[in-house]
């Protein structure tokens, strides 16, 4: 449910774009993301760092889009965010020797170090490619095509890659699940 909730601002952006224009849609995106963050803080008493960073990028690039009445800024936001994600994954692996993917998922999944590294690199590569593809779509094709790509294309690619990542680590999951089950067993049983 939480993952669906995070897509609400994107859905609002799409619907408002289809019924008005990119500038009003950008304003709706800023407001809906701000409300989502406020709701998360109210509900959980905290907000995830990635949500704050993404909102900050939307706020900066979205405000520039609206104030300067130039959609180039909101289009660049996608590229910059994906490039930063890619860079963060690479830096975490090569400079800190602690892949972000592992830091995010190690409480849920136990994988060998080389698998964490491969997964981290795969996601870094995906984000780098998506960053580059966004530049092409945003600046070579129509605004409507870019919005459709941003909302549906990037989402579909990310979901497909998540599925592929799951298939890649699948053979390691039974051992992890077994350990979790035995760790959670009630000693009185």
UniProtKB/Swiss-Prot annotation:
Topology with respect to the bilayer: Multi-pass membrane protein
Pfam families listed in its UniProt record: IspA
Membrane-spanning segments: 4-24, 53-73, 76-96, 121-141, 149-169
Keywords assigned: Cell inner membrane, Cell membrane, Membrane, Transmembrane, Transmembrane helix
Primary location class: membrane
InterPro entries from the UniProt entry: YciB
Subcellular locations according to the entry: Cell inner membrane
GO cellular component: plasma membrane
Organism domain of life: Bacteria
Entry similarity comment: Belongs to the YciB family.
Annotated function: Plays a role in cell envelope biogenesis, maintenance of cell envelope integrity and membrane homeostasis.
Name of the featured protein: Inner membrane-spanning protein YciB
Gene that encodes it: yciB
């Amino acid at each position: 449910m939480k993952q669906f909730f995070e897509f609400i601002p994107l859905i609002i952006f799409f619907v408002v774009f289809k019924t008005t224009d990119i500038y009003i849609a950008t304003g709706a995106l800023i407001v809906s993301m701000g409300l989502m963050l406020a709701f998360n803080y109210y509900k959980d008493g905290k907000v995830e760092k990635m949500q704050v960073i993404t909102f900050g990028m939307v706020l900066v690039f979205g405000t520039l889009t609206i104030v300067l009445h130039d959609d180039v800024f909101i289009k660049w936001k996608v590229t910059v965010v994906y490039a930063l994600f890619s860079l963060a994954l690479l830096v975490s692996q090569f400079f800190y020797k602690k892949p972000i993917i592992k830091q995010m998922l190690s409480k849920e999944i136990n994988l060998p170090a080389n698998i964490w590294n491969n997964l981290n690199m795969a996601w870094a590569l995906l984000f780098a490619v998506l960053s580059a593809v966004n530049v092409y779509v945003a600046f070579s094709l129509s605004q409507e095509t870019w919005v459709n790509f941003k909302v549906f294309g990037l989402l579909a690619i990310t979901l497909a890659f998540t599925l592929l990542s799951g298939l890649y680590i699948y053979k390691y999951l039974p051992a992890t699940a077994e350990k979790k089950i035995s760790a959670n067993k009630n000693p009185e049983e």
